[in-house]
Amino acid sequence: MDTITDIQVLKDTHKINGPEDLINKLPSIVGFKPSNESIVIVNTDIFSDYIIGCKVISTLDLFDLLEHVNDISNDVGTILCYYTNQKLDKIRPSAERLFDYLNNSINVRDVLYIRNNRWGSFICFDEKCCPTRGRVIE
């Protein structure tokens, strides 16, 4: 699997219109389709929905992820996208702990999961917005 070792600052900003648009655009932004057991860290302009940088990590290991996010400043918004084939109950606790930990020091806008051609949020509990079973990726 391809891995970007540092946050890749993008030459062009990419406007996103919500989580599904982000998930659909990520393969072209990072240059390949993220696969199971990877996390994409998306940095956005803190006041807008423009992507300014991305990083792909080829593990769901919480400690590996923490190493990579320690250098993110408060001046960016961060969205974490988990690509997984595991049952969500297995990774939800670590995703929620990660959100709690990171949100004390950086602006975490969302923690998304992508599984079996569906996406959802680990931190949004509004069934109209983010149903528990996720939304089909179109």
How would you describe each model-predicted region?
Residues 2-30, 35, 48-49, 54-60, ...:
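Charged, compositionally biased boundary regions
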Residues 38-42:
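Short beta-strand scaffold segments in enzyme catalytic cores
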